[in-house]
Amino acid sequence: MQRLMLKSKIHRARVTEANLHYEGSLTIDETLMKAADILPYEQIKVYNVFNGARFDTYAIAGPAGSGVFCLNGAAARMGAAGDLIIIATYAQYDEAEIARHQPKVVLLDGDNRPLSQGLKACLS
């Protein structure tokens, strides 16, 4: 049996901008995408901590080290600069893979810099 499990998460990213007139997506600092094992154009789920909005879009890489998290297109209506968001990806795993699976989790500070990595960091 296959189960849908958390693959990766960027926790408490601060939205840096919203661009309603871009074609869509969420622009994410390329360094943070790599740390969280998120590929360009991969489907992502976004959870806005400030307003409760939850939506699906896809990731595009922004400049490495910039700390950018830009809501693009229709997603720009789901939040504003300064909002805290959680970005998650999911993948299907079989029972053998689940036994050894650990999601990639990147916890950010208020300036979108990594504080720590790993699920335990979010729980403490």
UniProtKB/Swiss-Prot annotation:
The modification Pyruvic acid (Ser) is found at S25. It is found in: Cytoplasm. Substrate binds at T57, G73, A74, A75. Belongs to the PanD family. This is Aspartate 1-decarboxylase. Catalyzes the pyruvoyl-dependent decarboxylation of aspartate to produce beta-alanine. InterPro entries: Asp_de-COase-like_dom_sf (IPR009010), Asp_decarbox (IPR003190).
